[in-house]
């Protein structure tokens, strides 16, 4: 708490960044008082539902992502009953509520509704519950290390139904940790180094050359987020945190004029972003893009 109250006395700072839902939900009141724009990679829907004018996302809100996944489960997987595994934190509970709402709105029933703990190591009981439910597919919404452990346990117990998730499930880190147990996992992702767009490919090549590894979605979010700060600051014409936050409202930015954005992006009045996204599947240890999905508010 003492760390966050220090924002009140900071001067000359225009933006800050906090990565996950739990930390942004704690810090956002302090940065609001200090009138500092706060960028977050957190996906919890509650982040931008509180009317904080200084909060902006670098990833989709769960409210945007979950209907896209539910459409895929209904139209492509054609599942009638879906089991849900989620992590019991701000991130997981928000995702769980919205995927259930989105599935039920499409006539899909929920089978087992299974909570897991942050940092959980043993997923044997979770998988047993999913197998006993006998649903048509499993929706997994946990953090990266837990996702890898879940995938390994699913393979160990011979689970053969489709395993579907959002962003984390097919991320590079999960693939590395889960090994061949990640094969077949499907996810909607907002960003991936495997995207076919030329600017993303160029970023991927440069990142690998510099760091001898591939960037995951978090690296892309941070990179694009900072170029968003650059583009909007240039629009404002000066370093001014209040003017910057105001200029972020309903802004549309082009990757043609700011290549570091990699993709065209727009923000609404709440700080939620909109851009293209992807359906991915892990094939032979690699994330493969199967479909490019247009922005929700495509003009």
Regions found by a protein language model. Name each.
Residues 6-299:
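Extracytosolic ligand-binding ectodomains
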């Amino acid at each position: 708490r003492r760390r966050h109250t220090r924002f009140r006395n900071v001067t000359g700072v225009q933006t800050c960044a906090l990565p996950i839902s739990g930390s942004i939900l704690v810090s956002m009141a302090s940065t609001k008082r200090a009138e500092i724009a706060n960028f977050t990679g957190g996906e919890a829907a509650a982040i931008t539902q509180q009317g904080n004018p200084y909060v902006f996302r670098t990833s989709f809100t769960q409210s945007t992502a979950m209907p896209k996944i539910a459409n895929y489960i209904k139209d492509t997987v054609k599942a009638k009953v879906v089991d849900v595994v989620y992590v019991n934190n701000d991130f997981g509970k928000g995702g769980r509520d919205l995927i259930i709402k989105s599935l039920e709105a499409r006539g899909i029933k929920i089978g087992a509704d299974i909570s897991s703990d942050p940092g959980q190591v043993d997923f044997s009981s979770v998988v047993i519950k999913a197998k006993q439910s006998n649903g048509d597919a499993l929706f997994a919404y946990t953090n990266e290390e837990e996702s890898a452990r879940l995938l390994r346990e699913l393979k160990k117990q011979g689970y053969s139904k489709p395993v579907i998730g959002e962003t984390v499930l097919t991320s590079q880190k999960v693939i590395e940790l889960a090994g061949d147990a990640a094969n077949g996992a499907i996810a909607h992702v907002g960003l991936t180094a495997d995207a076919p767009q030329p600017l993303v490919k160029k970023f991927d090549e440069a990142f690998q050359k510099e760091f001898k590894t591939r960037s995951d979605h978090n690296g892309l979010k941070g990179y694009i987020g900072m170029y968003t700060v650059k583009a909007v600051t240039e629009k404002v014409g000066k370093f001014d945190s209040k003017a910057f936050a105001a200029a972020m409202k309903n802004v549309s930015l082009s990757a043609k004029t700011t290549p570091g954005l990699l993709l065209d992006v727009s923000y609404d009045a709440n700080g939620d972003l909109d851009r293209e996204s992807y359906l991915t599947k892990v094939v032979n240890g690699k994330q493969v893009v199967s479909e490019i999905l247009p922005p929700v508010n495509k003009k």
